[in-house]
């Protein structure tokens, strides 16, 4: 068994039958789009629920209600009313209560996605709130983003570098981003995606199945280490 898989097992509470996946990243990077695409692909195979975080609105929850295949009652918006860091890390009580309510409502739930409010590169989830974490950045922010570091870049279980199709328009060199991500991640996986066209979405799903759900499947070839 790899150290990565062992770590995932240790982080997961084996007394429950669901996994909590935290999804964080800067505003506009593609967090909500990732969850929307994922739920469309896996909702027929797994029982899924989603918790979203916005400071003053429930815009992300409303988007997912309109665009994902999940029933509205499986999507819950949390209005944090303040710094998005606090609601997922220092005081995650609102989100923990939302998760408890959701899994009580749907005892068959296998995956709970928890989307943070849009934040910078320092967002991290409380280990009580998320079993595994995905951090989303995008190419439009510039090729320098991976080497800027921060906990989201260096500590997340999976780094998603989204909007690869925009690289020619913003002067970003994907090979430079790959080199820097390898250096900053130190062996932890990352993946390039174009979520608008679902490019490498299957790789994210494969990572979830292998390292979050602990299925006996091959590591996706699109993952980079």
Swiss-Prot record:
It is found in: Cytoplasm. Gene3D superfamilies: P-loop containing nucleotide triphosphate hydrolases. GO terms for cellular component: cytoplasm. Its main location: cytoplasm. Keywords: Chaperone, Cytoplasm, GTP-binding, Nickel insertion, Nucleotide-binding. One of its GO terms (molecular function) is GTP binding. GTP binds at residues 25-32. GO terms for biological process: urea catabolic process. Transmembrane segments: none annotated. Belongs to the SIMIBI class G3E GTPase family. UreG subfamily. Facilitates the functional incorporation of the urease nickel metallocenter. This process requires GTP hydrolysis, probably effectuated by UreG. Homodimer. UreD, UreF and UreG form a complex that acts as a GTP-hydrolysis-dependent molecular chaperone, activating the urease apoprotein by helping to assemble the nickel containing metallocenter of UreC. The UreE protein probably delivers the nickel. This is Urease accessory protein UreG. It comes from Haemophilus influenzae (strain ATCC 51907 / DSM 11121 / KW20 / Rd).
